[in-house]
Design a protein with these regions (language model features):
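Short, solvent-exposed loop/turn segments at secondary-structure junctions
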Residues: 11-12, 35-36, 52
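Active-site loop of classical SDR/Rossmann-like NAD(P)-dependent oxidoreductases
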Residues: 43-47
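Conserved N-terminal helical subregion
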Residues: 4, 48-126
């Protein structure tokens, strides 16, 4: 069995741990410097269609629909005078199972850590 140490329990570290976890030949440990995972409610993230495609490899399809939003367009505004510049129809980039998505960072972290119990070691400095 190969041992893998992942430094950081952020979105990327938790995602790659989920990928490695699929292979029983790997023993994974995630080292996080903070004493707990940052689950502040206020931060939002936007996930492109390509991001959703790779998240689907670890079961993102089963993520609760009431915790995510799939907008149909993005509006762009001038920073100088707040006038709308244009909008972008993002549904053109979507497929049936991969849609541009927004959600709380804390919701994504909770999803990513669900199957990693016992693998995350907090309070470690490298």
């Amino acid at each position: 069995m190969k041992k893998i140490a992942i430094i950081g329990a952020g979105i990327s570290g938790l995602f790659i741990a989920n990928l490695f976890k699929k292979d029983p030949n790997y023993q994974i440990t995630i080292y996080e410097k903070n004493i707990s995972l940052a689950l502040d409610q206020g931060y939002g993230v936007q996930l492109s269609v390509n991001s959703i495609r790779i998240l689907n490899k670890i079961g993102f399809r089963k993520f609760e629909n009431n915790e995510k939003f799939t907008p149909e367009k993005i509006n762009f505004y001038s920073n100088e005078n707040s006038n709308k510049i244009c909008d972008l129809d993002i549904t053109e980039f979507n497929s049936e199972d991969c849609k541009y998505t927004t959600l709380k960072r804390s919701s994504l972290i909770n999803f990513l850590k669900t199957d990693l119990e016992g693998m995350i070691k907090t309070g470690y400095n490298i």
